[in-house]
Each structure stands twice: as structure tokens, then as C-alpha cells.
């Protein structure tokens, strides 16, 4: 391969390629009518919500997503819809303030999506954008070091789709 051609790929072209790669990776779930949430855990593992007999759960390591992040995010979306701001969670104790819930990270940027998007659209967009932003940071870092875009994209994929990162998003 001609190294001169590789070096002529611009940063913006690399970012567009990265956006296409992230969208392509998530396309089967997003365009297939699925959600990027561990709802199989809820349907099989959690009583009294288990609506079907126990079967093999695809990824039991991300149970926090179903037991904590989904309900917290649902409460936040309901608060945005009813109050117009991130306010009160009526589902815990006798009600608690959403900004006090540090596990939820209520000031995190992706929670603001719940204010103007439907719940599952905001949830999926938040996850896609987290992967995109992680890779974008790596692209900018590696490109600032003078590394050609194909290798920069390899670095973005390696960082963004690192197993520990995937498991906790």
C-alpha cells in the first residue's frame, strides 16, 4: 500500500468513517427493532418480573443495566415529561430527589436526551454516542501524534470496543 495515499486521508474523513463504523456495528439492533438494553435479564432472572421460564440469558454480566440504570433512567424520563426538569423519583423509598442519586450520574450529558426524545430512542442514542465519543477522543489523540488515519481508526476500535468498556456501558 502506498504510504502517501494513507497520509492524505483527512481527520474529517476519519471521523465520518468512524461514525459509519459505529452505526454499522449497532445496525442489527437499532434497525432490527431491538433495544440496547439487557431486557432478557428482566424477563428471565428477576422475580416477580420474570414472565417466562428460565432460559439462557445472553449476557448476565450487565445485570446492573436492567436492575438499576433502566429504572433510574425511566424515572428521569418520567420526571422530564411530567415536571419539565430532572426532579423526583417516586419509585425509591417514599420518593427521592433524582439529582441526589450519584449512581445514576444525573448531570451526565446523555440523560438530557430523555427530556426531548422517547425513552428507548434516548437510551439507544446515549449508548451509540458514548461509543462514538470514546472513539472520537482516541482519533483526535492519535491523529495529533501524526499517526495515519487507518491506524487511528484501529486505535479507536480497539479502545471503544474494549471488553471492559463494553460491559460497563
Locations of regions flagged by a protein language model:
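Hydrophobic alpha-helical transmembrane segments
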Residues: 12-16, 125, 152-157
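N-terminal membrane topogenic signal
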Residues: 2-16
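Hydrophobic alpha-helical transmembrane signal-anchor segments
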Residues: 13-28
Amino acid at each position: 500500500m502506498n504510504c502517501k495515499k494513507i497520509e492524505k486521508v483527512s481527520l474529517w474523513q476519519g471521523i465520518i468513517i468512524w461514525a459509519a463504523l459505529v452505526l454499522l456495528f449497532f445496525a442489527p439492533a437499532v434497525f432490527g427493532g431491538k433495544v440496547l438494553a439487557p431486557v432478557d435479564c428482566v424477563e428471565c432472572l428477576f422475580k416477580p418480573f420474570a414472565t417466562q421460564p428460565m432460559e439462557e440469558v445472553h449476557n448476565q454480566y450487565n445485570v446492573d443495566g436492567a436492575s438499576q440504570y433502566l429504572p433510574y433512567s425511566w424515572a428521569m424520563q418520567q420526571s422530564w415529561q411530567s415536571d419539565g426538569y430532572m426532579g423526583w423519583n417516586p419509585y425509591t423509598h417514599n420518593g427521592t430527589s433524582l439529582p441526589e442519586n450519584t449512581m445514576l450520574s444525573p448531570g451526565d450529558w446523555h440523560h438530557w436526551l430523555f427530556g426531548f426524545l422517547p425513552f428507548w430512542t434516548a437510551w439507544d442514542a446515549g449508548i451509540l454516542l458514548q461509543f462514538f465519543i470514546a472513539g472520537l477522543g482516541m482519533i483526535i489523540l492519535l491523529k495529533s501524534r501524526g499517526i495515519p488515519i487507518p491506524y487511528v481508526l484501529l486505535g479507536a476500535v480497539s479502545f471503544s470496543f474494549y471488553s471492559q468498556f463494553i460491559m460497563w456501558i
